[in-house]
Structure formats: C-alpha cells, structure tokens
C-alpha cells in the first residue's frame, strides 16, 4: 500500500506539470512603465508683495501672456487615436528541372552474349517541378480618444506621456493604454494631439471577460494540440 502511494505522487506531479504547461499564458503588455505621474510639489511660496495685481503662484506659476499648454510633469494631454494601416504581400515561385542520362556498353565478351543480350543499354531521365504561391493582407483601423499624463520632460523639451482608460461593462472589462513622446508644438490650442504625430507610440487594447474566454482554447484542447504530431 505504501509503495502504491509513493508511485502515485510522481504521476500526480507530472500531470499537474502538464496541466500547468497547457495553461493559458497571458500576452505580454505592449505599454510598460508608469501610466501616470503626479505633479511635483510646488516650491514654498514667498511672501507676496503688497500692491501687486498678478501673482504667478495663484495661477499655477504660468506667465500672464502664455497659454496653458502642457509642459510639466503631471499635466494632461488628450490623444486623438487615428491609426489606420494597410499591408499586402504576395509571392509566387515556379521552378522546374529536367535531366537525362544514357548508359551503354559498346562491346562485351562473346561468351556473355546470351546472358546480357543488350541489357546493359540503359536510359535514365528525370524531372522536377515545383510551384508555390502565397498572399497575405491586413487592414486595421483604430479610432477614439484617450487622455494621458505627462510623466517626464526630456532635455530638448519633448514630453513623455502615458495613460490608461478602463471600461467595465456587465461582466467584461476593456482597457486602452497609450504611451509615447510628444513635441509640445504639435499640441493644439484645445490640448489635443493626433496619435500619428506621437513618436515611439505604444497602443494597447485588451479585453477581459466572457467574450475573451470564449475565444480562448481550453487547456485540454491545447494539451492534445501540443502532443499531437500532426
């Protein structure tokens, strides 16, 4: 009885290892790093001089005649998603090869005439033909808006931005993540910028819920798919 128990333990461990190997591996995120950054604490305000009408500290330390475009860590920028890609690829291959060879013996000993009887004359020929074609195409469109936060300012003045939008509907949830580098001069007066003008753009759209589970193959099916040699 003790021997049976000892033998069952490795078998159960092997089955658990196989089941874990067939488990669904979550996809790696495209957007990495922080998705937001709070603004740094303001410096200690100095004593306000009496008689002054405009106080910079009362207006977020912005100059009087400057617009409120984002330029500091913690400011927000609205990204207008306008992504559209079209790609097509086609390939065709045609190859052929023919070959022939003739083998014969001009003279043979007379005592072997009845045995050979011109059987040494041989013709060899062969041919090889291969045809292959392939075609693929992709068409993707992604539109919408997402408001991001400035998480860093580069030495040349460009802004590092990142943001996330999560939407929960019934038992499912969806989220959009975005990160990239923006030139402040590309930001419009309404504090928006097109995603096509963002450098190093990372756009991620994922969903979790019943619809996502339906599109995923079961672990037992994945096991047989991995183990099958066909």
Curated annotation (Swiss-Prot):
Pfam families: FlgH (PF02107). It is a lipid-anchor. It comes from the Bacteria. A lipid is attached at residue 22 (N-palmitoyl cysteine). A lipid is attached at residue 22 (S-diacylglycerol cysteine). Keywords: Bacterial flagellum, Cell outer membrane, Lipoprotein, Membrane, Palmitate, Signal. GO terms for cellular component: bacterial-type flagellum basal body, distal rod, L ring; cell outer membrane. It is found in: Cell outer membrane; Bacterial flagellum basal body. Residues 36-46 have a biased composition (Pro residues). Residues 34-53 are annotated as: Disordered. One of its GO terms (biological process) is bacterial-type flagellum-dependent cell motility. Residues 1-21 form the signal peptide. The basal body constitutes a major portion of the flagellar organelle and consists of four rings (L,P,S, and M) mounted on a central rod. Belongs to the FlgH family. HAMAP family: FlgH. Assembles around the rod to form the L-ring and probably protects the motor/basal body from shearing forces during rotation. PANTHER family: FLAGELLAR L-RING PROTEIN. This is Flagellar L-ring protein. It comes from Bordetella bronchiseptica (strain ATCC BAA-588 / NCTC 13252 / RB50).
């Amino acid at each position: 009885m003790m021997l049976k128990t000892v033998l069952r333990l490795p078998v159960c461990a092997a089955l658990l290892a196989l089941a874990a190997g067939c488990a669904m591996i979550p996809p790696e995120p495209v957007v990495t790093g922080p998705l937001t950054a709070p603004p740094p604490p303001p410096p200690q305000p100095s004593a306000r001089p009496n008689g002054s009408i405009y106080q910079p500290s009362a207006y977020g330390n912005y100059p009087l005649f400057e617009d409120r475009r984002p330029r500091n860590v913690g400011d927000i920028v609205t990204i207008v998603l306008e992504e559209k890609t079209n790609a097509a690829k086609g390939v065709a291959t045609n190859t052929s090869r023919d070959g022939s060879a003739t083998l014969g013996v001009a003279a043979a000993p007379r005592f072997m005439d009845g045995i050979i009887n011109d059987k040494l004359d041989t013709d060899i020929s062969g041919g090889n033909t291969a045809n292959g074609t392939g075609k693929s195409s992709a068409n993707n469109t992604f539109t919408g808006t997402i408001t991001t936060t400035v998480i860093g300012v580069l030495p040349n003045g460009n802004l590092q931005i990142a943001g996330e939008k999560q939407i929960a509907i019934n038992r499912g949830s969806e989220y959009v993540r975005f990160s990239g580098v923006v030139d402040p001069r590309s930001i419009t007066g309404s504090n928006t910028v097109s995603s096509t003008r963002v450098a190093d753009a990372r756009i991620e759209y994922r969903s979790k819920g019943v619809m996502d589970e339906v599109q995923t193959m079961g672990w037992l099916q994945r096991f047989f798919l991995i183990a099958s040699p066909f």
